[in-house]
Regions:
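N-terminal localization/anchoring segments of enzymes in phospholipid and broader phosphate metabolism
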Residues: 1-533, 551, 555, 567-738
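Hydrophobic alpha/beta core scaffold segments
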Residues: 558-562
Length: 738
């Protein structure tokens, strides 16, 4: 019997959990400072929350359908995927509990001792009981569940205390006490040279029985509910007489009440209570987990933050590393007219970009500023710069994606403020999320329109620009500006951009271009010429791209992939992906930039983009990228890739079985931390040229053609009347988000 060829595909959900495993591994990595290890444990917990809310929630929805479709990569049904991820989640949670105990022990050696409420001495017992009675008890809202009192609604990600009660008159009932999210999650008390810390839910659980003094508490525990957060916009909601913000607001209300998909319990949770909650919330046994680590990992961020704030513990955290500021007198708005500019976050500050927006908003030659907005800071200076421009009389067009998951409300709020300032706000496509990072500043000089275009890999968010690695390419090349203008015009008219020369625009001109680039490398390899592909992004599961990568490998093309998260292609499979080398970088900063490089030397073609290689990016989103033709910047981008391929600190390399092994330095060689090395790499990144001649004018390209998206009506677009101008400072600092 002929042996079945080994699959090159990995299930998306299992690959997501593999990424979470790599994050969790840093919680035990001894080369990582203790305070940072606590944060990685917290990040792991936050990632698991999202995994259940989004992925398990979606799979749960699919199991309810009669036509149970399969995963397009591994062809597993939703039920099969849930069955596969269940033991993996349990394994990871057990590791997290083990690492948490190690962290607690290590903290004790540093003078931070966790309170064990089962072993309190009398003075401590008196202190904590008094604190509970004075500070917490008046704010608690206990609820009884019996024949006369229905089971209450339990909020997503909130912690609850539950007790099984018995009284002579009423028999068995249950008492539930919400642990208010308004409470300080971690409490700190000095005890001599030691700082004691306690999780507030454990304190409440220790004394909560006193609330139900009329009954006998037979059993008790803490638990936490995770609910499905996978909301979709139905066709019936696309009534264009209704403001789309109202639709999203209603969906957000519905999301709060979606089905429970996970229950977390204290260790040794009584089975009677577990069964009671399972029955009430309709959660199967395989999605109920007990854990010794905090039920809400967010409290670990609070713990690390307090230790950092105490001072004197610098060795417990990464050395300070702030984004490099531009030199005095550096003016990006002027500089980009002399040469293309690349900014790399978090190594360089985002401030020059913000100042560029402010300069444009005050420039009398500027006619309009257009920008796509996906995830914004809650107190966004970037959005305030747009508001200031509108109040200065500029036409400001903001494409706000209201469906950015978990940022919907923030985006709704900002869209209202933009509209109030006189900006034109529209919400993109019915069927495609707009995930692009695109800014276009249009000026009219001597009767001609001139463009300044910015294309990025990351959000317009000052906060995350210090945490995520991203790239921002800024140019005044006329041909790129014309293509960007066509993209904005097409989006406003609900049309998809299908033609461009330098830009990539998903879903019609993103995957096709990159597949053509791979085909060129395959053709070179078939001719015996040097050929190479380097792909850096966050995730990949597009089967068409995976098949092309396999084809390239079989043709002899070396394919290097730097994929931080989900990776559904298996490296090193004989006869399929032997020439594919995959690594994941997980470290101090979240790797977020996307760089696609084909060939080397003078023949090299290199792109940056907002989109990954997930099918949702290549086929169901409007993504934007650009081929970088500036030789100096192209070389800089290639240098980033080469440096990351040499990393021996943050890198883990995929093995042929799909597992990852930590990359270690060769014997006698120093470790290479590509993230920290970037600070040196971009040390002179703010290039100033005072005497460089202007670039020769490129021939004007025909405007990008567009194909109409299937059955697209007039866009949801509103433009409020322009209010009176309020002045720059007031508009920047007087409009804090409510």
């Amino acid at each position: 019997m002929e042996k079945k060829p080994e699959s090159i595909f990995i299930n998306r959900e299992l690959s997501w959990l593999d990424f979470d495993s790599r994050v969790l591994a840093l919680a035990k990595e001894k080369t990582v400072p203790l305070g940072e290890r606590i944060k990685f444990a917290a990040i792991f917990g936050s990632n698991m929350d999202e995994f259940f809310m989004v992925r398990v929630g979606s799979l749960y929805d699919q199991t309810l359908l009669k036509n149970n479709k399969t995963d397009n990569v591994t062809h597993m049904t939703a039920a099969e995927q849930i069955a596969a991820i269940t033991p993996r989640v349990a394994e990871l949670q057990a590791k997290c509990d083990k690492y948490f105990q190690h962290l607690v022990s290590a903290l004790a050696q540093e003078g931070y001792k966790k309170v064990d409420f089962a072993k309190l001495a009398k003075p401590q017992e008196h202190f904590w009981k008094t604190y509970f009675q004075r500070e917490l008890l008046p704010l608690l809202s206990p609820q009884i569940v019996d024949s006369r009192h229905p089971f209450p609604f339990l909020n997503n990600k909130d912690i609850y205390y539950i007790a099984q009660l018995h009284s002579k008159n009423e028999g068995i009932s249950y008492g539930i006490v919400p642990v208010s999210s308004q409470f300080e999650r971690v409490l700190f008390v000095k005890d001599g040279e030691t700082t004691c810390f306690a999780f507030v839910e454990e304190l409440i659980a220790h004394y909560a029985a006193t609330i139900f003094s009329a009954s006998t508490v037979q059993k008790q525990c803490l638990f936490r509910v995770t609910r499905n957060a996978d909301i979709t916009v139905d066709e019936g909601m696309m009534d264009h007489d209704v403001d789309f913000r109202d639709v999203m607001s209603e969906l957000l209300k519905k999301r709060r009440k979606l089905a429970a998909v996970r229950l977390q319990f204290w260790p040794d949770a009584p089975q009677e209570i577990v069964k009671f909650l399972r029955d009430k919330l309709v959660v199967p046994a395989d999605r109920c987990y007990t854990q010794t680590s905090p039920l809400d990992s967010g409290s670990l961020f609070k713990l690390a933050g307090r230790i950092s704030g105490d001072g004197g513990h610098t060795a417990l955290f990464y050395p300070a590393a702030k984004p490099m500021q531009a030199p005095a007198g550096y003016d990006l708005y002027t500089e980009v007219r002399k040469h293309d500019v690349l900014l790399a976050y978090p190594y360089q500050s985002i401030r020059p970009f913000i100042k560029m927006l402010l300069r444009a908003g005050a420039d009398p030659d500027v006619v309009s500023i257009k920008m796509t907005l996906y995830r914004m800071a809650s107190d966004s200076q970037i959005v305030n710069a747009l508001i200031a421009a509108a109040e200065n009389g500029k036409e400001v067009v903001a494409m706000v994606e209201l469906r950015a998951r978990f940022d919907e409300q923030n985006n709704i709020d900002w869209s209202k403020q933009l509209e109030d300032a006189g900006c034109t706000v529209f919400y993109g496509f019915d069927d495609y999320k707009v995930h692009s990072k695109l800014t276009l500043i249009t000026s009219r000089v001597n009767g001609q329109y001139k463009y300044l275009t910015q294309i990025g890999t990351g959000n317009y968010n000052e906060k995350t620009s210090e945490l995520y690695t991203d790239l921002s390419f800024i140019t005044t090349r006329q041909e790129i500006g014309e293509e960007a203008s066509a993209v904005f015009n097409n989006m406003a008219l609900q049309r998809l951009t299908s033609e461009a020369d330098t830009m990539l625009v998903a879903p019609l001109r993103f995957k096709t271009v990159l597949l053509e680039e791979m085909d060129r490398q395959i053709a070179l390899a078939m001719q015996g010429k040097p050929a190479s592909i380097i792909l850096k992004n966050n995730s990949i599961n597009d089967p068409q791209i995976i098949d092309k990568i396999s084809e390239a490998s079989c043709a002899g093309v070396r394919v290097d992939m730097i994929v931080r998260g989900i990776c559904c292609v298996r490296a090193g499979v004989p006869g399929r992906t032997e020439n594919v080398h995959i690594r994941s970088l997980v470290g101090r900063y979240l790797e977020h930039s996307r760089i696609y490089c084909f060939g080397s030397g003078e023949a090299m073609r290199i792109y940056i983009a907002s989109g990954d290689f997930l099918t949702r990016n290549t086929e169901r989103r409007v993504e934007v990228g650009v081929r970088v033709d500036d030789p100096a910047i192209a070389k800089k981008l290639r240098g980033i890739l080469d440096l990351q391929l040499r990393d021996t600190v943050n890198a883990r390399e995929m093995q042929p079985d799909g597992t990852y092994a930590k990359v270690r330095p060769a014997e006698g060689q120093p470790p290479v931390d590509s993230q920290m090395a970037m600070f040196g790499y971009f040390q002179n990144g703010f290039v100033q040229e005072t005497d460089k001649p202007e670039k020769p004018k490129a021939e004007s390209k025909p405007k990008a053609a567009a194909v109409k998206a299937a059955v697209k009506p007039v866009p949801r677009q509103r433009a409020a009347l322009r209010p009176k101008r309020a002045g720059l400072l007031q508009s920047l600092f007087g409009r804090g988000k409510k």
